[in-house]
Amino acid sequence: METNDKEEEQAPEEIDKAPPFGSIEWIYYWSEFEGSLPTPIDVSITGSLKYWCPDLEWYNFDVYPHKVKITNTGYTVLLGAKWRAERPYLLGGPFSEKHVFSQVHFHWGSNMMEGSEHTVDKRIYPAEMQVTFFKSEYMTQQDALRHPDGVVIICYLIKYGVNSDERLQWVVEGFTRIQEAQTSTRIGPYPLSRLFPMFFEDYFLYWGSLNTVKGENFTVRWLVPRATLYASFEQMKEFRKLWNPWDEPNLRNFRPLQERHDRHIFFISPHWSQYNSLLPIPRVPEPSIAILSPAYKTRPWLLPPQNADLLPQENENGEDKII
């Protein structure tokens, strides 16, 4: 009886430990309880929790990298890049600290009726592009995976489009040089802002596990933006021409859909029409919302020649300005 009394006395204290609703800390609070739940899942506005965060800020995504390399791992296409100075990173939104860019990889299926890992409103899409970031203090993605706040993956759904998406085309054009597994080639280089749409609001966030081929499970934050990419039938055919480790066409590399298990799905800073969970593809590409980081602003000579338009220019009053 004494033990039960003590447990009852401690219960209110446990509840009081939860951060206040509306804070970024309240989102992090649920990682302990939901970070081990399986992924991917279906997301939708229905059943999600509307939650407001500061604007998500995209730093250095207009800066040209020194090189961009794509690799056919035999399981996916992996895109990595290197910069001579500071790499792109995220700040703001649900992040209290800087999260730097790590890599991009893709998931696809054997036809246009499958391929995406996540579904939206129970609908499957032909492909999905996942962009991985990690908390800068952990130095590497592998180290960051061992911390519940270490890694975030942004999952862009790829819809079917009659025309080719130019944002994907400069990547797809390199596939003929990496048809065999474990082969790589350089492409571009172009800034990451040319590959995927940036957003500062209107996205879903949830906690879930990332399983590796070694059987390890890591807690990851998954972001699914309402903004999407699109791919033509011909572009998707190029994905299916890539070989797996057994010298066969890699036709399917997506994981099966998992149950939601009553976890929190945060609908961060909703803004546009909520008639559909995904936004329509804009007829005209959205202008870049990338920000130049203080490191480049104070040392503009670190910018590559292709970014001359970002260099400080002297105005009529003799003052420097960024154009």
Q: What kind of feature is each model-predicted range?
A:
Residues 1-323:
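Alpha-carbonic anhydrase
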